């Protein structure tokens, strides 16, 4: 993938979610929820502060994160893969 996000943007790939219930039933449609965990594929240079300095991002390529899947999440297909472009503000946690 040849894409570089700008500023405080992060490109992530959503992790696959289990499509079977605990009882073994295959979940489809609205019953199958999308994961809010993702792998970080690329990060921007950082957030530009009011004084003009750039604050580097806390996340780095390869991190697994939990993100807020709401307004402001942009879905794109790049090289045949669906990725999400989000602001670092939409990342809630880094899974360690």
From Swiss-Prot:
One of its GO terms (biological process) is chaperone cofactor-dependent protein refolding. InterPro entries: Chaperonin_GroES (IPR020818), Chaperonin_GroES_sf (IPR037124), Chaprnonin_Cpn10_CS (IPR018369), GroES-like_sf (IPR011032). SUPFAM superfamilies: GroES-like (SSF50129). CDD domains: cpn10. One of its GO terms (molecular function) is protein-folding chaperone binding. Pfam families: Cpn10. GO terms for cellular component: cytoplasm. It comes from the Bacteria. It is found in: Cytoplasm. Keywords: Chaperone, Cytoplasm. Together with the chaperonin GroEL, plays an essential role in assisting protein folding. The GroEL-GroES system forms a nano-cage that allows encapsulation of the non-native substrate proteins and provides a physical environment optimized to promote and accelerate protein folding. GroES binds to the apical surface of the GroEL ring, thereby capping the opening of the GroEL channel. Belongs to the GroES chaperonin family. Heptamer of 7 subunits arranged in a ring. Interacts with the chaperonin GroEL. PANTHER family: 10 KDA HEAT SHOCK PROTEIN, CO-CHAPERONIN GROES. This is Co-chaperonin GroES. It comes from Haemophilus influenzae (strain PittEE).
